[in-house]
Amino acid sequence: MTTVYDVSAGELIKETSRDLKENVKLERPEWSIHVKTGVNKERKPEDEDWWWVRSASVMRKIYMEGPIGVSKLRTLYGGKKNRGRKPGEFRRASGKVLRTILKQFDTLEYTKANKNGRTITPKGRSYLDGISTKINKQ
């Protein structure tokens, strides 16, 4: 059986985000159309499907690096802030966005909260492995 480790990250995230939007019906909160993904960004995302792309990326991170918490995810998705003439500094990503995505996965039972952070459940693992198998057959 094909796993997440056997397919490229870009293809997996693209296919998973499409599936989360169309089949799983992962809902984007109303406030998400107005927010930036972090303090280091100057504008909100241009891609209208950014919520599902970020969700797919977070799910892959939990699969590969779990258990992983919100703090570590904020660091992974953070970036350099442009401070004008002053030197740029690293800023962490938005915690609200990541917490909301993780809560959505918990309600779908794709992840489970532990003492050390979120881990992928067997249901979430089989979901991602199924998408990986579908990508590998193409």
Language model regions located:
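Residue-level detection of the helix-turn-helix DNA-binding "recognition helix"
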Residues: 78, 103, 129, 133
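Long, low-complexity, charged/polar intrinsically disordered regions in eukaryotic proteins
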Residues: 1-56, 60
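Short amphipathic alpha-helical elements of helix-turn-helix/winged-helix folds
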Residues: 58-65, 76
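Charge-enriched amphipathic alpha-helical scaffolds
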Residues: 54-57, 91-102, 106
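Short acidic, hydrophobic short linear motifs in intrinsically disordered regions
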Residues: 67-89
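A short, conserved structural fragment
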Residues: 102-116
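Short, amphipathic alpha-helical interaction segments positioned at domain boundaries
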Residues: 122-138
